[in-house]
Amino acid sequence: MAANYKSCPLKKRPIVFVEERLPQTEALALTKDSQFAQDQPQDLSLKRGRDEETQDYQQPEPKRDYVLNLSKTPERNSSSSSNSCLLSPPVEAQDYLPTEIHMRGLTAGTTGYTTATPTTINPFQSAFVMAAGCNPISALWSSYQPHLAAFPSPASSMASPQSVYSYQQMTPPSSPGSDLETGSEPEDLSVRNDIPLPALFHLFDEAKSSSSGASVSSSSGYSYTPAMSASSASVAANHAKNYRFKCDECQKMYSTSMGLSKHRQFHCPAAECNQEKKTHSCEECGKLYTTIGALKMHIRTHTLPCKCPICGKAFSRPWLLQGHIRTHTGEKPFQCPDCPRSFADRSNLRAHQQTHVDVKKYACQVCHKSFSRMSLLNKHSSSNCTITIA
């Protein structure tokens, strides 16, 4: 009996799907059934036989931990081999080839640093291996810094018996209780101050250190200078390169010859040119000037290069000619703000504005009467003033 879903919402009504089966051959049906059986997930509830489990199980290869001796340089001797025996793996581990060694961050390139196979060491290869997985300071200590042989290596301090457990972060112990058996705490390398920092110094040979007076000699016979000396020397070299011109009188330095010549001409008090001023005389009237520029401006008063095109009158300055041309055109652009009068020149407007103030610019010393122009004051002093000038 079909259910009635008339009152049920559309999104909750079931969908009726009718599968149309097509006729197929017997061979095709068998192939489809076999593929369907392979696609089905494995039933884990069924127990398999013990022989099937042993066939699927593969025993993983045991991992062995190795502690590397980083305290020695790549040049091995009898003393280094005796010290490395303290940190070497067990005897049975020596049967493994170097390519079978599994360690954190190390590959088959660690042939020179495994204590199991003492082979010839390539310093560049070993330095790359140390920088890749272990300790870059120990690798670069002897390979690239041959002058630091007198200083203690950071790896030697870490590989010492007191701090042998400092490698726990790199290689864990073989058993969980090995740390508790010794009863010693790992050494904190952040508070050590006996490890020198070669990056803060510039190393030099003995021949170079003898020529440098600011170098400091160490107990090992090599000398070093602080890094600030190189920067200060470069600054001094740049300063000497930029300021090449020097005044012989006051020892001041200038970057250009023009600056030095102007200093000698105007500013230097020890120069003879400033002690006895050179004078330039006018050929027309004989006036003397201290600078050539002032003499050229004076010569224009004799030549009068600015001429009026209307009346032919000449002037020494172009702005004087411009004010003269306004007298021909009748233009008066400067107007008085207090009265309706206007003027062709700005100087005439300023003189006119003195008539509107109570105290003028020019005053008589006898009667204290003030005037807007100097010409009016002179006219008053000669005729109108009743008190004679003593």
From Swiss-Prot:
Keyword line: Developmental protein, DNA-binding, Metal-binding, Nucleus, Repeat, Zinc, Zinc-finger
UniProt-listed Pfam families: zf-C2H2 (PF00096)
InterPro entries xref list: Snail/Krueppel_Znf, Znf_C2H2_sf, Znf_C2H2_type
Gene Ontology biological process terms in this record: asymmetric neuroblast division; central nervous system development; compound eye development; ectoderm and mesoderm interaction; gastrulation involving germ band extension; Malpighian tubule morphogenesis; mesoderm development; negative regulation of DNA-templated transcription
Subcellular location, record wording: Nucleus
Zinc finger extent (C2H2-type): 245-267, 280-302, 306-328, 334-356, 362-385
Region annotation Disordered: where it falls in the sequence: 29-65, 162-191
Molecular-function GO term, any one: sequence-specific DNA binding
Region (SNAG domain) residue spans: 1-20
Biased composition (Polar residues): 32-43, 162-172
Entry keyword annotation includes Zinc-finger: yes
Family label: Belongs to the snail C2H2-type zinc-finger protein family.
Known role: Essential for the correct specification of ventral-dorsal patterns.
Protein name, UniProt field: Protein snail
Lineage per the UniProt record: Eukaryota, Metazoa, Ecdysozoa, Arthropoda, Hexapoda
